[in-house]
């Protein structure tokens, strides 16, 4: 099959999807914003061709590249796995006659207000929400549902541009910070109290072929705002437990409601005093290299299963569930440049056999801000057969390692 893949080399994790497609015999062609010469040699060796355009979200330019490819060969699929690219790819697919995720599905997985309306219509519990473009409308919503409220871009990804307001005064400050006070259209939602996690799937022809559940410790907004916290994301191997059955059942309902056919999915959820509620839905894989955790935990190549699903509408391996797998982010103690680490010898001495991935930027490397994400600075990924033991190990690493900056 001939597959067009958007941004085949950046961010670095994109290369795994290209690798998997090439490994099952697909002819892979790239469309991206970087010059071909900037691609790494391994990715170049796996591409049959490449078109550079100014922006992969600029639909006329993307459509030009796709039609150029179609002039030379039959294009079976146009694939992307990055949130910001999903809607543009869907629009261009429909204009060029290429099968795949529809524009409706892509839009429902991108526009937070429409997404939650579709979930409520399907009977999926979710936060009360609305789209607003004036402070007065936001204040009216807050009076209706009560504080706290969450304000975010309608097309937000992760915690980017997300604010919490606990009072009218804070809501007015948020309105100025996010542009609402100047007429920007944003999504506003009730704050859902509870533990936060996510449900990820590989869905084939509308049926969930394999699935995973991960937990945030602590919840994302707190993790992305608090330097001293070493936040964790942990994938469970206890999918047989009743609570996960409830998540899976709602996940199937979401898949049907949004019209997801063959795609990776990412579904955020909260569990608290009001029960289980689904939040953001993405028609793409999770971020923070989480598929690498699923591969390590399940003793299989999830990227290959995705490639088989895209190219042949099937998968041939399931995760073993032998391990739980988690990542812990280790933040610098201040902004600046890395000077040194303390505690590394201790954790490698204790847990070397559990570690399946890590990154410790060399001294002199500039630090990244806390809000840049879980893998922006130092991190460690580990697996263990027992979920609770893994949590204890991750906690110990967070208490032992210090990333010093100056």
List PLM regions with ranges:
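Flexible, glycine/charged-enriched surface loops at secondary-structure junctions
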Residues: 261-267, 316-321, 404-406
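Conserved ATP-binding module of the ATP-grasp superfamily
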Residues: 125-129, 144, 148-151, 163-198, ...
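A glycine-rich beta-turn/hairpin centered on an aromatic-Pro dipeptide
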Residues: 308-352
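ATP-dependent carboxylate/phosphate-activation module, predominantly the ATP-grasp catalytic core
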Residues: 190-260, 264, 271, 278, ...
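Short beta-strand-to-turn element immediately C-terminal to the catalytic PLP-Schiff-base lysine
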Residues: 132, 162-167, 202-204, 272
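ATP-binding N-terminal substructure of ATP-dependent carboxylate-amine bond-forming enzymes
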Residues: 1-105, 136, 332, 361-366, ...
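A structural supersecondary motif
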Residues: 265, 347-365
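A conserved helix-loop-beta module that forms one wall/lid of the active-site cleft
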Residues: 94-161
């Amino acid at each position: 099959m001939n597959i067009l893949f958007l941004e085949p080399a950046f961010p670095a994790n994109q290369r795994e999807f290209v690798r998997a497609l090439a490994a099952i015999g697909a002819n892979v062609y790239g469309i991206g914003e970087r010059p071909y010469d900037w691609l790494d040699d391994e990715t170049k060796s796996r591409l049959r061709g490449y078109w550079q355009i100014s922006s992969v979200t600029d639909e006329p330019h993307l459509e030009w590249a796709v039609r150029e490819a179609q002039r030379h060969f039959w294009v079976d699929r146009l694939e992307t796995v990055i949130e910001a690219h999903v809607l543009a790819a869907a629009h261009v697919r429909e204009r060029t006659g290429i099968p795949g995720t529809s524009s409706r599905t892509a839009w429902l997985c991108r526009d937070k207000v429409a997404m939650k309306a579709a979930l409520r219509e399907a009977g999926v519990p979710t936060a009360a929400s609305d789209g607003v473009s004036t402070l007065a409308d936001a204040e009216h919503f807050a009076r209706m549902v009560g504080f706290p409220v969450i304000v975010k871009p309608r097309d937000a990804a992760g915690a980017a541009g997300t604010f919490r307001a606990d009072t009218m005064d804070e809501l007015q400050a948020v309105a100025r910070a996010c542009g609402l006070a100047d007429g920007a259209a944003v999504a506003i939602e009730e704050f859902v109290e509870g533990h936060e996690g996510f449900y990820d799937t590989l869905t084939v022809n509308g049926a969930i072929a394999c699935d995973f559940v991960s937990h945030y410790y602590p919840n994302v907004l707190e993790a992305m705002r608090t330097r001293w916290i070493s936040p964790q994301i942990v994938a469970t191997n206890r999918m047989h437990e009743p609570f996960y059955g409830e998540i899976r059942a709602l996940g199937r309902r979401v898949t049907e409601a949004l019209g997801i056919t063959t795609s990776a999915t990412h579904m955020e959820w909260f569990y608290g005093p009001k029960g289980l509620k689904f939040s953001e839905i993405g028609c793409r894989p999770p971020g923070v290299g989480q598929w690498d955790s699923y591969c390590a935990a399940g003793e299989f190549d999830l990227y290959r299963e995705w490639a088989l699903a895209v190219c042949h509408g099937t998968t041939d391996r399931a995760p073993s569930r032998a391990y739980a797998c988690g990542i812990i982010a280790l933040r610098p103690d201040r902004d600046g440049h890395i000077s040194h680490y303390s505690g590394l010898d201790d954790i490698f001495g204790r847990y070397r056999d559990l570690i399946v991935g890590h990154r410790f930027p060399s001294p002199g490397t500039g630090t990244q801000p806390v809000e840049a994400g879980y893998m922006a600075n130092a991190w460690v990924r580990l697996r263990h057969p027992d979920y609770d033991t893994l949590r204890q190990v991750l906690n110990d690493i967070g208490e032992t390692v210090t990333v010093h900056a100056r």
